[in-house]
Curated annotation (Swiss-Prot):
Keyword Secreted carried by entry: no
Organism: Escherichia coli (strain K12)
Top enzyme category: hydrolase
The name this protein goes by in its record: Phosphotriesterase homology protein
Subunit structure and binding partners: Monomer.
Activity regulation information from UniProt: Activity is higher in the enzyme containing Mn(2+) than that containing Zn(2+).
Amino acids binding Zn(2+) 2: E125, H158, H186
Database matches in NCBIfam families: PRK09875.1 (NF007373)
Cofactor binding note: Binds 2 Zn(2+) ions per subunit.
Enzyme Commission number, as recorded: 3.1.-.-
Amino acid sequence: MSFDPTGYTLAHEHLHIDLSGFKNNVDCRLDQYAFICQEMNDLMTRGVRNVIEMTNRYMGRNAQFMLDVMRETGINVVACTGYYQDAFFPEHVATRSVQELAQEMVDEIEQGIDGTELKAGIIAEIGTSEGKITPLEEKVFIAAALAHNQTGRPISTHTSFSTMGLEQLALLQAHGVDLSRVTVGHCDLKDNLDNILKMIDLGAYVQFDTIGKNSYYPDEKRIAMLHALRDRGLLNRVMLSMDITRRSHLKANGGYGYDYLLTTFIPQLRQSGFSQADVDVMLRENPSQFFQ
């Protein structure tokens, strides 16, 4: 796994994802190589060196695409292994054992993905449904815990609209996972400070990783929650990203692009009173400690 701890890291992104069949919308097929390479070059000029790519099997993952992007742009892409959430599971999640699902993850970590030399560096994006953990999602979380315990690779989760994060952590902890090796995704989609504080108190990292998606939750509220965490001295448990998933998110297609976090959100954060050191903690120091 290539990772540069001296640069910034986007903790939850997608470079190649295809949920278009499920969502009946071609915009959800993110696969435009030239446009994405240009955006990765732009990120490199702004100090980003690592992108954590959260597209796992059956979400449209493309290992060769990631390898090609790395070779062309020089950016590090950390690939993942796992299963997303119940609505997107292939049939065999129901029929295979927990141990078999865990072994699939271990194989992608230790041997490689889809016959390529690219190995998964993280167990992710493992998810739960809104307001509940289904039996199959619980099965995947247990398998992820087994794979983590065998390989030591960290776990990054998907919460649906900032629900079930505490329950995810309880499930992983019950199966032997050190919660300092877990980061909870999508904590920034509702007024969620109380739960965020509890998750951090348990030892986990939290991600504000849908930055720019103001139709879900406005960035000014994200900034207010980040201030509340800063005031409590808890920025050492926060990571940032944007969760780009659609063609329309790309700058070439009229979207805000992967660098919106750096060109728009961080300046807003700085203007609100955050120091450059605060920014560096969330974008460099925390990811470097967590993902390596």
